[in-house]
């Protein structure tokens, strides 16, 4: 019985230690296909390497939140960090600016990464 209690306490300590670890997300914004003005495409925001899992991701058009956005299920890597993909259909042109805004406990304020049509 005593061994069980000790083992249970060790497991709890390990799990609580995982919550104390914080890793800032890496944010990558890119289109599925090379950008061509007037041609439908998909805008992707891949957020990876973050911990803990609580995160808020928004895709933006000219600084305003795009409402029709889909995302993958929250997944984790071998190192227990998390990753997600947010995406939406869009039609690029010369005047509109697209970006991904991420809020996470590791950022004092939300971080915004602009889409570079040449990447």
From Swiss-Prot:
Keywords: Disulfide bond, Immunity, Immunoglobulin domain, MHC I, Secreted, Signal
Residue span(s) of domain Ig-like C1-type: 25-114
Gene Ontology, cellular component aspect: extracellular region; MHC class I protein complex
Residues spanning the signal sequence: 1-20
Subcellular localization: Secreted
Main location: secreted
GO biological process terms held by the UniProt record: antigen processing and presentation of peptide antigen via MHC class I; immune response
Disulfide bonds: 45-100
InterPro entries assigned to the protein according to its UniProt record, in alphabetical order: B2Microglobulin (IPR015707), Ig-like_dom (IPR007110), Ig-like_dom_sf (IPR036179), Ig-like_fold (IPR013783), Ig/MHC_CS (IPR003006), Ig_C1-set (IPR003597), MHC/Immunoglobulin (IPR050160)
Family membership noted in the UniProt record: Belongs to the beta-2-microglobulin family.
Assembly and oligomerization: Heterodimer of an alpha chain and a beta chain. Beta-2-microglobulin is the beta-chain of major histocompatibility complex class I molecules.
Function: Component of the class I major histocompatibility complex (MHC). Involved in the presentation of peptide antigens to the immune system.
Protein name: Beta-2-microglobulin
Organism: Sapajus apella (Brown-capped capuchin)
UniProt lineage: Eukaryota, Metazoa, Chordata, Craniata, Vertebrata
Gene expressing this chain: B2M
């Amino acid at each position: 019985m005593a061994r069980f209690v000790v083992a249970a306490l060790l497991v709890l300590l390990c799990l609580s230690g995982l919550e104390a670890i914080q890793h800032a997300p890496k944010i990558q914004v890119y289109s599925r296909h090379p950008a061509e003005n007037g041609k439908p495409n998909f805008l992707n925001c891949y957020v990876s390497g973050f911990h803990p899992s609580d995160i808020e991701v928004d895709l933006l058009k000219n600084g305003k939140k795009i409402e029709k956005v889909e995302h993958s299920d929250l997944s984790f890597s071998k190192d227990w960090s998390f990753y997600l993909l947010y995406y939406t259909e869009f039609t690029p042109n010369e005047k509109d600016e697209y970006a991904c805004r991420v809020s996470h406990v590791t950022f004092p304020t939300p971080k915004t990464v602009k889409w570079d049509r040449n990447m």
